[in-house]
């Protein structure tokens, strides 16, 4: 499988916002992004970084993909998290996830994320989970780049 990555394109931000139901107003103006393009040139996934707090070293991310597309590869994960931890120099990545998305929560747990349950985050009947990944937890994971492991 051949994937290509594009950085900083507004098309990626629109793509991600359209695929996530709770992003009804888009993302803040000071966002960053990585788009994932397949061999035919079609955008199949995207990652948006927003609410970057440089002082505290935190950044929030949102990711979305077309259904049935294999995009969450080791290389994509490495690029996404190295961007946050190396380029942005963050010490923590934060992702909000619907409580019923057990598959994604399972994947994030395997990466070493810690979780905070947030009742009603997505409305009266829909809970959310704040998923927190520190640079130390990522550095301990085999998918991290050598740069991240050396810095930890």
Predicted regions and their residues:
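Conserved acetyl-CoA binding element of GNAT-fold acetyltransferases
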Residues: 55-68, 96
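Conserved active-site alpha-helix within GNAT-family acetyltransferase domains
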Residues: 100-117
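A conserved beta-strand-loop-helix scaffold within acyl/acetyltransferase catalytic domains
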Residues: 26-30, 39, 44-56
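C-terminal "cap" of GNAT-fold acetyltransferases
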Residues: 122-152
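Short amphipathic alpha-helix that is part of the acyltransferase structural core
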Residues: 1-24
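Conserved GNAT acetyl-CoA-binding A-motif
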Residues: 86-97
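Conserved catalytic-core motifs of GNAT/GCN5-like acyltransferases
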Residues: 96, 114-129
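Conserved glycine-rich acetyl-CoA-binding loop
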Residues: 66-78
């Amino acid at each position: 499988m051949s994937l290509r990555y594009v950085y900083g394109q507004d098309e990626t931000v629109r793509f991600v916002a359209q695929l996530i139901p709770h992003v009804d107003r888009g993302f803040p103006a000071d966002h960053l992004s990585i788009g994932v393009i397949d061999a035919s040139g079609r955008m199949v996934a995207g990652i948006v970084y927003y609410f970057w707090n440089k002082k505290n070293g935190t950044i929030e991310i949102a990711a979305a993909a077309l259904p049935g597309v294999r995009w969450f590869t080791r290389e994509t994960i490495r690029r996404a998290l190295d961007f946050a931890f190396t380029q942005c120099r963050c010490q923590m990545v934060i992702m909000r996830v619907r409580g019923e998305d057990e598959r994604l929560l399972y994947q994030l747990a395997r990466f070493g994320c810690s979780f905070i349950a947030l009742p009603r985050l997505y409305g009266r009947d829909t809970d959310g989970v704040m998923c927190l990944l520190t640079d130390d937890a990522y550095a301990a994971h085999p998918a991290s780049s050598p740069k991240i492991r050396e810095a930890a």
